[in-house]
Each structure stands twice: as structure tokens, then as C-alpha cells.
Amino acid sequence: MKNKSSRTRVAILGSGSIGLDLMFKVKASEHFDLKFVVGRHANSDGLKLARSCNVETSSDGLDFLKENEDAYDLVFDATSAAAHKVNNGFFSGAGKFVIDLTPAKLGRLCVPCINLDDIGAEQNVNLITCGGQASLPLAYALKQAVDEIEYLEVVSAIASRSAGIATRENIDEYMTTTEYALAQFSGAKKTKAILNINPAEPGVRMQTTLYAHARYRDFDRVRACVAEMVEKVREYVPGYRLVVEPIESQGRITISLTVRGRGDYLPEYAGNLDIINCAALAVASHRHATARLGATQ
């Protein structure tokens, strides 16, 4: 175990499913010293669980982090898009590095397997959406393999029990941010994102299907680029795998994937939450390594 002084001090803002799963991931890492889990309701199950894990908690939200701004260096914001826009006003002024797990789209868009090395000294990194983290690696791989993408559609299906209040309240932002990121990372002329919430019991594992109308000359190159990208994602999301490898018909490419969660806190079927948390941890670990390298030079 590393000395606490060599670890990055972390606060988690948001005590729902994403925040709690992050708590277990952060506590398991030797790179981080988890200082706080902060929510809004003192008697919430999330804050009770955090306290039972010997983590300091508060139900005072952003006000608590303002009062204790010298106690942490990095914040995971797992609230909502609207709340993040308020929260980041303080964090940016205080010089805190924020990893935004909401679809607020304020900071640098990041998918670790694509542009982790490009985030540099950004104050705010946005992880887009769970569907974005699942589909964008494949969209980017297609960009490398085809001449042009005319239209790109992504359909994600998730279990109802893995869709919390914030997810349901942010549906519009989910669509807008995912579609924007798809255009940015793929170069597609038109994009569309669809999220289906499946009430089936037991919960069904997250599945995302990508449809692309594209011009290409070598479909073997499409397969190779997609396969290479899948392996890159699996470096930080081990449960990421294709269920339908690239197939083509009359200029339309179809690819489908599933994500099995690690089961740190969330059930394995909640791959939609696990993938964005794994991405968050990858970004945080990269920033930790960069900061430590800078301190030794």
C-alpha cells in the first residue's frame, strides 16, 4: 500500500448507484485516498453504506466541499447535468480537477481508449454517457476504416434497475450529448442515439448496437480496426465484448456489443454504469500518474 501522502485525495459528489460503485473502485486502488462521499439526504441508503465503509460523509452537497476545499484534489461528479453546471462554477475557481459523469458536456470529452493522452491539464473532463462510452470506441474505429460515414445510429438497452433517478431525469441530455460526441469522434454527417430501458426481471445485461451507413473499400479493414479497438477497451473494461461482429449489407454496417459489470458494488448486468465508472477510474489514474511524474521532475 502506498503512503497516503503519495496518493491523490478524492471526493465523490453523488451517493447514488454510480457514486457508490465508484467508492468501491476508488477504495480498491492504491493510487487514491478517498476523503469524502457527499450527497443530499442524510438518511439515504448511499450515505449509510459509505459510513459503514468508514468513509466520511456529508448530506450538505456542494456546500460541504466548499468548506473543505483544502482536503481533496480530485472530484468525481456523479450528480446530474443541471447540478454539474452549478458545481463546476466552484470547482473551476478552486482549481479542482473534475471528472464529470453527467451529460453536462462542459469539459473535454473523453473516451480513454481514444484520447486519454490528450486531456493534458484540462480542469474538467466529461465522460459523455454510458452509451457513449460503449459505442464511441466502435464509431472511432469505423472512422479509421471507412472513407465516409453518412449516418450513424446507436441503440442502447439497459435494465430498468440500473437506471436511477439521475439517468431518467437526464434522458434529453443523454441523447444530445451522445449524438454530439458520435459526430465529433466519427465524423458522421448525421447521428442518432436511442436509449431503451428494459423492465424485465431478472435485469438484462447492457447491450449497444451501432448502425452505420458508410462508404468503404475494404471490409476486412473494418473488422480489423473494430477488433483492435475492442481489445483497447478491455484493458480498462474487462467485461466489454462483441456479440455481433461487423456485418455489412448494402452499405450498412451493423455491430453489437455487451458490457458485463465487474460486480464491485453494482450487479453484473449493470454494465452501463460499470463502463462509465471504469472510464472515470482510467482518467483519474492517468491524472494521478501525470501529477506524480511532474512532482519528481
Swiss-Prot record:
Organism superkingdom: Bacteria
Catalyzed reactions: acetaldehyde + NAD(+) + CoA = acetyl-CoA + NADH + H(+)
EC number: 1.2.1.10
Residues the entry annotates as binding NAD(+): 15-18, 162-170, 272
UniProt keyword list: Aromatic hydrocarbons catabolism, NAD, Oxidoreductase
Catalytic residues in the record: 130
Family statement drawn from the similarity comment of this UniProt entry: Belongs to the acetaldehyde dehydrogenase family.
Name of the protein in its database record: Acetaldehyde dehydrogenase
This protein's encoding gene: mhpF
